[in-house]
Amino acid sequence: MEIKNITVLGSGIMGHGISQVSAMAGYNVVLRDIEQKFLDKAMEKIKWSLDKLVSKEKITDDERNKIISRIIPMVDLNEAVHNTDLVIEAVPEIMDLKKKVYAELDKVADNHVIFASNTSTLPITEIANTVSNPERFIGIHFFKIGRASCRERV
């Protein structure tokens, strides 16, 4: 399966960074959070980071604009996972919260969608057992968001 569309759940430090590097890699990204104000702040941070790359001549203005155009901020979960291939969850490291997110996600995502948790401290198998098809669940951990393309898969 080729991945073209990614949904990132959570727009905090990790979520907005994952969205940025995914868009920089050419993927279409939906950045989803529970309130618009969180999304607005995340998009400001992404734009600031990209502006810095432009000022250092790492990317052009045109590339910056194309990257930003590939990120769609969204509050509605159903809409956020529509047509997605991969969901990367980056919500706070609270097991009950992650389980709640995946229980909701399991109800609305298509059967082909891969679920990925960015957790660095919680057991992946415990989170994966929340969904109906745990075999489509992976752990993926990003490092140095926005500066490197390094990630760990569990």
Model-flagged regions — what are they?
Residues 28, 86, 113-114, 135-137:
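Structural motif
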Residues 37-41, 52-115, 121-122:
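Rossmann-like NAD(P)-binding element
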Residues 30, 72, 88, 138-140:
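Hydrophobic/aromatic beta-strand patches that form the interior of the parallel beta-sheet core
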Residues 18, 98-99, 125-127:
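Short glycine-/acidic-enriched loop or helix-start segments at secondary-structure transitions
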Residues 1-52, 56:
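NAD(P)+-binding Rossmann beta1-loop-alpha1 motif at the extreme N-terminus of oxidoreductases
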Residues 20-23, 47, 81, 106, ...:
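A structural alpha-helix within SAM-dependent methyltransferase catalytic domains
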Residues 117-153:
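Rossmann-fold dinucleotide-binding core
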